[in-house]
Amino acid sequence: MSSVCLAAGDKYVPVRIDENDIYSGVLKLLKNIRPNWAQGKIKLKTLTDGITNKLVSCQFLDLNDEKEIMLVRIYGNKTDLFIDRTAEIRNIKTLNVLGLAPKVYGVFENGLAYQYYPGSTLDVESVTNDNIWPLVATQMAKMHRVQLGRDVPKEPFVWDKIEQFLSLIPDPFTSEEKQARFANSFTSITKLRIEYERLKSHLIKTTSPVVFAHNDLLLGNVIYNKDEGTISFIDYEYAAYCYQAFDIANHFNEFVGLSIEDIDYDRYPCEEFQLMWIKVYLATYLKVDHPSDAQISQVYTEVQQLALLSHFLWGIWSLVQFEHSDIDFDFGRYAEIRLNRYYELKDKIFKQLS
């Protein structure tokens, strides 16, 4: 639908930031990509929104402008096992040309430095604000209209990604406590693999179009700039071609929250809200003033089905993180929440698809 874009090059800095001494590593990085910043005038702040990576904001105090802040992302432990960092940077730089992603300032051995977007991340209250959600729907539609170069795989990424995650679940877990929790909640990896094959046999039939999607629009990855009335997306680790309805459903699944103690499925958006959201989305995606009721209904149906796929993907992902991540987050419990939700919904969805 849009012109094909190719990513530009980027600056590589041969620095590896130690997770136990992050600030020293960040300052060493800044000497290379911001040599004019006096080290004594740099303010560093660790941000806490993410559950995959560690993030540090860097501000040169002589420049009293939020737009001059730089973010440094240090990749989470072992995340290179399942995230294609070359593709991630290519995607960010390509989307930046279109005004859909931040500028990359530099890449280092275990992370990247990129542009800060002024504003605030969404939360369970603001995501349904009438001034905000239409901006999110429109921004997603703009992204879904992007076409990448011929070298980028156009098949839905989600099936290969789930298979990759399944292959990375340890058998057994290195900790006896973790293995016991896994066995108690999920029995075995074999059972999960069988469930995956059943899920795929049903959902592979979806008629949802394949688009270039973000695939991880949790609330912390959406920035709202109230002063400018704009929405920006960040963190393109999982950006790839996938089903249109998967990206929408995945975003709706995040309305319930991410903090383990606060997840509440009563916050999941009702049918009326979803239909309004999809209508706004389709107006931009299809470039029409008034999408038809049939078009809206079709996407709504596909979203309900592919919400199931989102739960399974992130449940399996969380089991991999349960073994490897050193982020302070209960990935074992999160896997239980997402996969339990999957099992609650699957019979109804499978019946619809039969």
Language-model-detected regions and their locations in the chain:
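Helical subdomain adjoining the active site within ATP-dependent kinase catalytic cores
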Residues: 290-354
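Short proline/glycine- and basic residue-enriched helix-capping loop/turn segments at helix->loop/beta transitions
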Residues: 192-196
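ATP-binding pocket architecture of kinase catalytic cores
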Residues: 45-191, 202-209, 227-228
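Active-site activation/catalytic loop segments of kinase-like enzymes and analogous catalytic loops
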Residues: 245-290, 308-326
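Catalytic activation segment of kinase domains across protein kinase-like and atypical kinase folds
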Residues: 220-259
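Juxta-kinase regulatory segment immediately upstream of eukaryotic protein kinase catalytic domains
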Residues: 1-45
